[in-house]
A protein has these predicted regions:
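Hydrophobic alpha-helical signal peptides and transmembrane signal-/tail-anchor segments
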Residues: 2, 6-14
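N-terminal amphipathic/hydrophobic targeting modules at extreme N-termini
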Residues: 7, 19-20
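Active-site proximal loop and beta-alpha junction motif in alpha/beta enzyme cores
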Residues: 27-105, 111-308
Length: 308
């Protein structure tokens, strides 16, 4: 038996003298590298049909490289890391990582992170409002009996899109330029370029091509339908065009753009992910101060620990 620090290593021989190893933790304190972990499904009442996010709850001591490497390993659209807040108003601080980079804000990971913080014992200062600290500032998350909803942050970039870029977006979506009835920069962190088509049917028919853009597309369902709009989101990862199942940040910035232009009237329900086998449902509302809220159902599908 060899003891190295706080790890005990037992060298064990079976009856045939074959060597095996038994690693035992001498003290519970060794969990300095063992951290609570959960994988949350966001924006669907049906588990495994929304958009997953991996959440590491105890992240003191992790550096940027360790967070990025773990996010690369999970290979989900986002992995989040919860930390003590630096702002006294906030309940916790979160960092968002894709497999290749850190983001200043992300929508469904905000709701997943808030839910993880709650199920692992977090108690908000205000009973029904959680305050999240992230790179874009403080994000308020409301909870009721069935939904978590975040307050859409201000756009980092808005306004009209150059015609050459609109043409590039049409090529990336495999559609005619004339099919795009409007477009705008609607960046609240990930870099979204918003594209509006005439109908949900047209949105569902998109067959995306290779792109260097981060594209969000929306089209309306016929009046009286359960959903008001269909949304799809596309971005490039490693040179491959990827479709995001259900996207909170995009639905937030889409709402700010199109409600602000007087074309959409909240509240409304968005469908997303249908083409790729998901069943995302995004609840969009606006309060009396004209603050846009993005909500959905949230489910914890995996809980345990990870070692980082």
């Amino acid at each position: 038996m060899v003891s190295e620090g706080k790890v005990v290593v037992l060298f064990v021989f079976d009856s045939q003298r074959r060597l095996s190893f038994d690693y035992r933790r001498e003290y519970a304190k060794i969990v300095g590298v063992q951290r609570r972990f959960t994988q949350i499904d966001v924006f669907s009442g049906k588990p495994y049909r929304g958009n997953p996010v991996a959440v590491v709850v105890d992240c003191d001591g992790l550096d940027d490289g360790e967070m990025q490497q773990f996010a690369r390993w999970t290979n989900l659209s986002e992995t989040t890391f919860l930390l003590p807040p630096t702002n006294p108003v906030a309940d916790y601080r979160v960092r968002f990582f894709t497999p290749i980079e850190e983001l200043p804000f992300a929508g469904h990971p905000t709701l997943g992170s808030a839910y993880a913080w709650l199920i692992y014992g977090g108690t908000p200062r205000n009973q029904n409002t959680i305050v999240q600290e992230c790179e874009v500032g403080l994000i308020h998350v409301n909870r009721d009996e069935s939904l978590l909803s975040f307050a859409a942050p201000s756009l980092l970039r808005g306004g009209s899109v150059e015609e050459s870029v609109v043409g590039e977006a049409a090529v990336s979506l495999g559609i005619d330029r004339e099919a795009i009835i409007d477009s705008a920069w609607i960046d609240n962190g990930p870099g979204w370029l918003g594209v509006q088509l005439a109908s949900a049917e047209q949105v569902l028919a998109i067959k995306p091509q290779k792109t260097n853009l981060t594209l969000g597309v929306i089209g309306a369902y016929p009046a009286g339908s359960r959903f008001a709009y269909e949304v799809r989101a596309f971005f490039s990862s490693g040179g491959i065009t990827v479709e995001d199942p259900v996207t909170g940040s995009l639905n937030a910035s889409m709402a700010q753009w199109l409600i602000g232009a007087g074309r959409f009237a909240p509240p409304y329900l968005v469908s997303q992910g249908k083409v790729i086998g998901h069943a995302g449902e995004v609840h969009v509302s606006m309060d009396e101060t004209n603050q846009v809220w993005i909500g959905g159902e949230v489910t914890a599908c995996i809980q345990g620990t990870v070692e980082i």
